[in-house]
From Swiss-Prot:
GO terms for molecular function: rRNA (cytosine-N4-)-methyltransferase activity. Gene3D superfamilies: Putative methyltransferase TM0872, insert domain, Vaccinia Virus protein VP39. This is Ribosomal RNA small subunit methyltransferase H. GO terms for cellular component: cytoplasm. It holds the Pfam family Methyltransf_5. Its EC number is 2.1.1.199. It catalyses: cytidine(1402) in 16S rRNA + S-adenosyl-L-methionine = N(4)-methylcytidine(1402) in 16S rRNA + S-adenosyl-L-homocysteine + H(+). It comes from the Bacteria. PANTHER family: 12S RRNA N4-METHYLCYTIDINE METHYLTRANSFERASE, S-ADENOSYL-METHYLTRANSFERASE MRAW. Specifically methylates the N4 position of cytidine in position 1402 (C1402) of 16S rRNA. The gene is rsmH.
Amino acid sequence: MPPFSHVPVLADAVLDAARRIPRPDGLLIDATLGGGGHSALLLEQHPGLRLIGLDQDATARAAAAERLASFGDRVSIVATNFADYVPPEPAVMVLADLGVSSPQLDVAERGFSFRLDGPLDMRMNAGGEGETAAELIDRLEENELADLIYGYGEERLSRRIARRIKADLKDRGSYDGTAALAYAVAGCYPPKSRRGRIHPATRTFQALRIAVNDELGVLDRLLQQAPDWLEPDGLLGIISFHSLEDRRVKTAFLRDERLQRITRKPVVATEQEEEANPRTRSAKWRVAQRLAAA
C-alpha cells in the first residue's frame, strides 16, 4: 500500500483565515485529520496551538502521527467519526476537509476508485462495520437505486444507470469490482460523452460513497454541533467538494444564530493550485465565527 501523502487543498486560504483565531494558545480541532497536512501548517504558523485530530481511518491516523510527531504533546489523535465526538474544552478553531483523500482514491482496495479495480467497498472505516457499496446496490430496488444516484450524485442518467446495474446483477449475481461497475455506468453514456474531462462514473460513485458513509447526515450533525465546540470568536472552517455539501454549509452559516459568516462567497483554488493538484478544482472553503453573545 502506498504511503498516505495527502496534499492539503486551499492551504493558503486556511492559513489566512486562521489569523483570526481569538488567542494563539488555544485548541484546534481538525475534524477530518487525514494525513495531517492542514494541521501541520497551522501548528507551524501558531506555535502555541494544541491539536486534537479526529479520523476513523487507521491508515490516515498512522500517517498523521508520523507527520505530526515533531509537535510532541501538542498533538492528540482520536479514532472517531467527528459526528460522535465531544471535545474536552472549547476550541479556537474547528476545521473540516470533507473530501476523500488522494491516498483513499489511489488505493484500489478501498473501493473508491473507478480508475483502479478493487472491491466495491467505499467505507471510510475500511473493514469496519456498515454496509458496503456492493451490498447497497444489491439490496436496493431499481427505482430506489435510481433515486439515490440522482439525489446524491445529481446524475441525469440515473434511471438508465440503475436499470443497467440491476440487469447486470440479475445476469451475473454481483460485480467483480469497481472497474466492472465503472464500465457498466460508462456504457450508459453516448460515446461522445465518454471522452470528457470528468469520467462518466464520477457522479454514480459519489452517490454510492455518500450513501455508504451517510456523509450528508454526518455533515448535518457536524454543522449542528461544531458551533458549540467553539469559544467566543472561535472559527469554523469547512472545505467542501460538491454542491450538496456546499449548499448545506452555506445555509447553516447563514441561518445559525450562533455564527457570523467571514466568507460571503466561497474561496476556491487558484489556477496555479489547480494545475499543481487537479483535485482542488471543485474545492470550496467557507469560514464562520462564533458570536460572543450567542
